[in-house]
């Protein structure tokens, strides 16, 4: 009995110890592990048993390829650039560090960041926590080896989940208040002295940046359904045009949790899920939409105090928020400075000299709908996991987390889907008419801030207060095709126009962009030649056709053939190069393409240059033709040609210069020629490049992640590439390899199945575990 009692006590103690250990284990984060298998071009295929493990693998792999990039962006979204790099240096977006820091200190307050974090699902939190652990794990390993040259400094540190929240919040406001950083940082009452944010040069750059937003973050998309595809199943062309550098640089990867998730595509920095991609049953992409995601409010100020405003006749004080930013001094010391941001109940006061002035009568407040969007990560993860197009569409309806893009998709059953279901302020056409000045136009929506009736309407069916519910937004489900190239929702498919929406959502009967006209023209021609194949979608991008050339080249050549008088000799080389040009933006296209760009850019700024004006009844073919018979048009054309001739000569370009000699990208320590050109000229393969001092042009954005996905009885069959390559580290072997493939127009199979992955000639596998000090490499 004594022995039995002792055994019983020992057993009970063992049970208690076991329960204690189990409880302690539950209170601790589960130790994560992941397999990282890399295939050609270093594309990581990350597999784990749960979200934390998957995030761990994503963060580790991303750090292997872009350690310094993410560290730099973390410093940015924490408002610490001035502290580490100095207040007068500039971000990659050409924004002064001091202004950037003030903006992100305002945007990412501890309260806002914590509220976003608390709103996340357990799965999303686990992904983010795993990502942090994976990134920090690789950072620790790399510190032992020595950090890359481009990120030597105390600004490189372990990250936290809150850092990823801040990155996400920056992404959310890219289509809204993020474009007003200078205006927010520079807003001061009329009696005060304007600070650094009021510099005119900074606002000129900001104005250009705002105008370029849709160009630098544009996109093309085509989804083909069973009625038009070669095999009766769905097909998708995804061609997002995004920056090649900085915090909006896509990263390619494949994510798997057996039995739960299997998705491949591309994601933006710091995001532990796919933004654009495909899974077993469907493929999807996004295009930047034309919807409005913020409104301005013109405040009527209290005559006694410009920091008070009148609402329904009552004087209300503006809220004052004091921000503190650390500035690195020339001697290396750090000085803290304070700045006050003013806000009304609608949002922060923004001051843009000559546009949005803060005087003694009026001030302007900005309300961004995406500041309250804490659903974006849940949204993309639900889309990643969708097992059907119906489930995919339902997730967007229910969550409403898409910030400022359209969504196009195709599935293995031959259905196609277009959704303009982003976060849009609920301002009806009627309210807009009552609450805005029609003379201002619709480029920026300015509502009456003195009348509470002009507040955004509330729909109980919407996911957040003040936005449109999903069933009030444009969407189209078809079996022939849907397409989009950053225009409104109107002609996603001309056979079924989408009309009658608030101007904040979509405007119809407006001129189409030239990329959309090209797409509809090409799809129309393909319809006459038979079913559409994957190669047809690839050629839409890789043909590098300059669609506008077909609209105006006969007129340009006719002008050249006329008597040019005293300018004949000066314009002879230009006219000869235009005549010899092939009408494309290929590497071997002649210098005529340079002249064409130089001539058309100033002409397009003028009114009434077209022989056939825009006709809303024929939007696919109008406007067209240069009205060279009109003296003002002929004079403007002559001046543009003379200017181009002089510019090309000064740049050192010769008659035998090719486009590939001009447009290049510097990566991996080398320069790579890049085909493609301005989307404003109708180049579907839209590439944005900026002039350099040596006469060349450096690529900054454009075709980034490119995928063409079809389906058969086995699942998705995909080809694609990441034009900017996987790694931003110039020392990496993955810094330039896909860029060369893009230059040569060589898309590769995207390995999705286990057989495809393991049979890849460059296959390598790595297993990582949180507790390991050594990694298993096979």
Briefly describe each language-model feature range:
Residues 1-11:
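Bacterial N-terminal signal peptides that target proteins for export
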Residues 28-247, 255-260, 264-273, 278, ...:
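Substrate-recognition/specificity elements adjacent to catalytic centers across diverse enzyme folds
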Residues 57-58, 102-103, 110-126, 365-367, ...:
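Second-shell loop/turn segments in exported
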Residues 493-567, 571, 661-778:
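Terminal end segments
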Residues 257, 263-268, 277-280, 286-443:
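Glycine- and hydrophobic-rich flexible loops that cap the catalytic core of alpha/beta enzyme folds
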Residues 418, 427-433, 567-663, 669:
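A terminal-accessory region detector
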Residues 20-23:
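N-terminal signal peptide c-region/cleavage motif recognized by signal peptidases
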